[in-house]
Amino acid sequence: MIYHVAKTGNDNNTGSEKNPFLTISKATQTAHSGDTVIVHEGEYRECVSPVFSGDSAYERITYTSADGEKVIIKGSEVIKGWKKEEGTWKVEIDNEFFGEYNPYTTTIDGDWLMSPIDKFLHTGAVYVYDSALKEVADESELLESTWYTEQKDGKTVIYANFGGYDPNQGITEINVRQSCFYPKETGVNYITVRGFEMAHAATPWAPPTADQPGLIGPHWSKGWIIEDNIIHDSRCCGISLGKEISTGHNPAVNFGRKSGYQYQLETVFRAVQAGWCKEKIGSHIVRNNTIYDCGQNGIVGNHGGAFSEIYENHIYNIGNRQEFFGFEIAGIKLHAAIDTHIHHNVIHDCFWGTWLDWQAQGARLSSNIYFDNIDKDLWLEVTHGPLMVDNNIFASKKNFTNNVQGAAFVNNIFAGTTQYYSVLDRSTPYHFPHSTAVAGCAAMYSGDNRYYNNIFCGKDADGWKAGTDYYNGYSASLKEYLECVHTHGRGDIDIFMREKQPVYINNNCYLDEAQPFDREETNINTKQASNISVTMENGKIHLEIMLPEEFDDLKPYGIKTETLAKPRICELPFENADGTPIEINTDMLGKPYRNTIGPISKLKSGNNRVLIWSAQ
């Protein structure tokens, strides 16, 4: 059955093409497995909450915009009645207007939020022609393009400094709904959402120990497809593949009886007991979306994003306004990305690019382009492998915070620097293969990583290193490492903590002032200037890099399951998410490799200028 929604419709209609519904929400009460809801051009100010599930990946419920028609779903309302007072404007709104959720009494707070915590900001926002003003915590701070809110006599009062703009004459909007497309209940499976612009959601701070609503998301379900959408101006999170509330909600802030780490560890086991498994949760597809201007994340998720595929998304301007800050901000921030494949995304101008935290077992980060990110491109934290990072270009000044063991870094360009550290005071879980079942917990000892066929550029700066020489002094085989461990006699975890795990490093190219691991047998080590740049102009991204004469003679190390040492802790092979052997034999553009290293097969000695991405 096909249902239609149009601004000319009526919710008492049948939903046919000639007699469409007025709201998408009405269609959610009618559409069942196998049905399609076609939404026609216009602006829909509602939170769409699907009621029914599809029966399978082949019998899903599809919500889509009509071909060639622009459909916008907004979590905001246009607000008139602003009154000018001494250079600023004020509007008073009865709190009943907001219903059950008032973004101007709901603060941005939760576990791992670090600032501001003296005067909290709010999940609401004020927009002028789709451009968000900045919230300030005190009325005295109302400079141009800022706003402030307070409660008076059962009313929400908003003060704003619009400069020379009259908010009653143009389009001035405020957030009023938490989400744009998000089920109220969990377990609404096999939904497709395609072709919408969605904006202005009053989403809350979403750490891994809390309920994690986004502007759009499946809300702890299975098999969603979110594709071909434009998603922007979510106060915190754009797309959420996150956990739900029953397994904990900001316990560190709300109770404080234990560390956030301990609560997060408990969340893992609570999730398993609550039914977190491949058969029920995850396996989502997020593709070909444009996501920008969100305060915390473009894509976020703890547990709920496992077994998913995230690809061909363009993500930018995430967390870059820095109105608030905490340790959960990134273009993509996932915990427990088990068997999740993140590939062919373009991520730039974010505070942090991609952050995979805890349990990224079986994950693959492939063929992504990072540049102009504020702090760094990639953070891999307290996870034990196997984790494959291949065919990526990391082109910001700071590339990578390395707090991972059991990973393979293959055919990448690292154009900047790396920060490296171990974590011996936190043990995090690892799992049985391709499963959420917990197999054990371990500290992050450092080492046990593999680097083959990469190109390193840049020079050391601010305590961060260019190249792989921060591994100098590490052993180069498991046999050697274990011999060192057992020289300490019989013991337990203490003797393993005294030694650094082995690293497997070969066939890399080092340019500028980048330096190799001192036991790397085959490499190119030259101080030749790389002149590397990644630039975007007119919707096209080009890579430019100068490579030395020796580059054409360095043959790549063959990357497949049998040539990669198993991670020591989890003792599992590098393989595809379906359990088949993995082999890296194509570049980031999908071309077969031709005896070259790096992410692009046609790289050669001399100056290279390569088109690596073009907007559709």
Predicted regions and their residues:
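Non-catalytic carbohydrate-binding regions of carbohydrate-active enzymes
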Residues: V410-F432, F456-A461, K465-V485, Q515
